[in-house]
Amino acid sequence: MAQLVHVNGPPGIGKSTLSALYAERHPGTLNLDVDVVHRLVGGWTDEDNRTWEVVTPLIRAMARTQLDGGRDVVVPQYHARPEEISALEELARKQGAVFREVVLLDERSAAIERFGRRARDDDDTYIQYMHHHVGSRGGAARLGAMYDALLDLLRLLPDATVVPSTAGAVEETYAMLTDALRGPGG
């Protein structure tokens, strides 16, 4: 049975890296990285372009098509509102797929530091854009609030699996992720 795996976690925690690795090692899996799709829309750096209004339906349509074909989808994306998770879960259910919620977590202060380090170490346009975007909206305080919101959400998601994510431990974290997906329901 196909599955839709939502890889959640604070910004900069390793969601995109681990999802790309998962798709690479599980042929046929669609790594539906929202950050990548976002960049496909012309003018995505212009806030007035409201790119998210286009990207969200695109992501859902792509996931639906992949699941209809009986293939897995992995979606690396921070979500901290219950309705965002419910929408993904409902999409999977309507396509006859299993929904899995995996949350990557590090300590709060480490997660905030990892976001900053990512921008210092990587000149990728999207990473730099998001660093500026978050910085203009409160920086570390905003990241802390996002982390706290994610922890609050976890209390509402009894079926979510938390996977510890340590900076630089990609293979170790990947092993825990795949173990979690092989567990009940995976």
What are these language model-derived features?
Residues 16-69:
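Conserved substrate/cofactor phosphate-moiety recognition/catalytic segment
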Residues 13:
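ATP-binding Walker
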Residues 10:
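P-loop (Walker A) phosphate-binding loop of NTP-binding proteins
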Residues 95-115:
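Conserved phosphate-donor/acceptor-positioning beta-strand/loop module used by diverse small-molecule
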Residues 54-99:
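Glycine-rich phosphate-binding loop used to anchor ATP phosphates in small-molecule kinases
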Residues 7:
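Hydrophobic anchor at the beta1->P-loop junction of P-loop NTPases
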Residues 1-4, 71:
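Pre-Walker A (Motif I) flank of P-loop NTPase domains
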Residues 121-172:
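Small-molecule kinase domains that catalyze NTP-dependent phosphoryl transfer to phosphate-bearing small molecules
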